UniProtKB/Swiss-Prot annotation:
Highest taxon above the source species: Eukaryota
Major subcellular site: secreted
Assembly and oligomerization: Tetramer of 4 heterodimers of alpha and beta subunits; disulfide-linked.
Protein name (database record): Snaclec jerdonuxin subunit beta
Keywords associated with the record: Disulfide bond, Hemostasis impairing toxin, Lectin, Platelet aggregation activating toxin, Secreted, Signal, Toxin
Organism: Protobothrops jerdonii
Known role: Snaclec that strongly induces platelet aggregation, in a dose-dependent manner.
Location of this chain's protein in the cell: Secreted
GO molecular function ontology, one term from the record: toxin activity
Disulfide links within the chain: C27-C38, C55-C144, C121-C136
UniProt xrefs under InterPro entries: C-type_lectin-like, C-type_lectin-like/link_sf, C-type_lectin/snaclec_domain, C-type_lectin_CS, CTDL_fold
GO cellular component terms listed in the entry, alphabetical order: extracellular region
Signal sequence coordinates: 1-23
Amino acid sequence: MVRFIFVSFGLLVVFLSLSGIGAGFCCPWGWSSYDEHCYQVFQQKMNWEDAEKFCIQQHKGSHLVSFHSSEEVDLVTSKTFPILKHDFVWMGLSNVWNECTREWSDGTKLDYKAWSGQSDCIVSKTTDNQWLSMDCSSKRYIVCKFQA
């Protein structure tokens, strides 16, 4: 009987791992997870170009944060406001990367928008996710994101 239970459990583990059920994903220590992506708030202030380079150095595939839903925005706001209070964070959106079309610095489509203005580099307010244009050389906080 014990052997039957052991074999049955082993088959269940193999089935679940092959089917992807319960297979989940893990973010590195200090990173938050949402919808198979990992996020981290950094308290350093940098200009947009240095911030994007910084994110790329933090983890393979990491870039400045991109938003694709209001739920994703809610998660990032819940992580940034307690740490940064009333301030701004760079988003991975600027004309530096693509003069003709708007896309995130990670190459994904700009499919969620909350514009308040337009310029070369875009920030998000930590309190209400209002998007604002800022001079790319100004120094702002950083949120990095990568797909797990």
